Amino acid sequence: SMTYSSALFNSDKESLEKAQENKYYNICKNINPKPDDHLLEIGCGWGGFMEYAIKKYKVNVTGITISKAQHDFTKKRLFEAGLADRAKVVLNDYRNQRGQFDGIASIEMFEAVGEKYWPIYFSTLKNLMKTGAKSTLQIITVADELFPKYRKNVDFIQKYIFPGGMLPSKKVLEKQFLQVGLKNVNLKSFGSSYSKTLRLWHTSFNSVWDDISSVKFDDRFKRMWNFYLASCAAVFHSKTGDVIQVTLKKS
């Protein structure tokens, strides 16, 4: 599915692919789009949500990304799926996006914004929403009591995996969207699903290591990636971290 964010498991028997669809379904259920509505995805990744939303809900979706590789892959993916007439993939920074939309989705993009720019993110989000529209954001969070210490230190992930990244806590998030006048109408936590997602990624990564190493990746990368996947799975299992889908409404 080319998806690199948490799946949502409704049962232990579900496949990773089905659980990723559950995530998309829950986002669409909260945004509640009508056919021909125009949705925006901030950080469209490799196009999984765009494809799902267009197929299942007959909506039009604009996806923005700052990655040329993702832009090109997603355009090709949606064209080959016969969905190009309802899709627009734009190489753009979210702060430069114009227009207003019937709903907005953003899946684990917020973590890369940086604390300094959180107020800009939420004010931009509000400006891009039509009155009455809803946005559903999937965001990784740090436990409230750990946030003050976390924000003062650079951890392994910030140094080696996602430089410049910063996770919020739930209370910090709430303060940010209330300041711009967005109302929280739904919040779902599913950290245990992220733990399972990461464990499945870990197994899959090692099962195809011979193929990966034949490209250009060495044993140092393998150790780093295994540590990243295993340690993150432990964070969500221990509940020191969580992942949420929060739905915000513009009144």
PLM features per residue range, with description:
Residues 1-30:
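Conserved Class I S-adenosyl-L-methionine-dependent methyltransferase catalytic core
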Residues 35-43:
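Conserved class I S-adenosyl-L-methionine
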Residues 46-57:
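Conserved SAM-binding loop of SAM-dependent methyltransferases across substrates and taxa
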Residues 74-75:
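Conserved SAM-binding loop
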Residues 95-104:
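A short acidic, Gly/Pro-enriched loop at the edge of an enzyme's catalytic core
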Residues 119-132:
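A short glycine-rich, Lys/Arg-flanked "PGG" loop and its adjoining helix->strand segment in the class I
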Residues 132-140:
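Conserved beta-strand signature within the Rossmann-like core of class I S-adenosyl-L-methionine
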Residues 141-245, 249-251:
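Substrate-binding/catalytic lobe of Class I Rossmann-like enzymes that use SAM or dcSAM, i.e.
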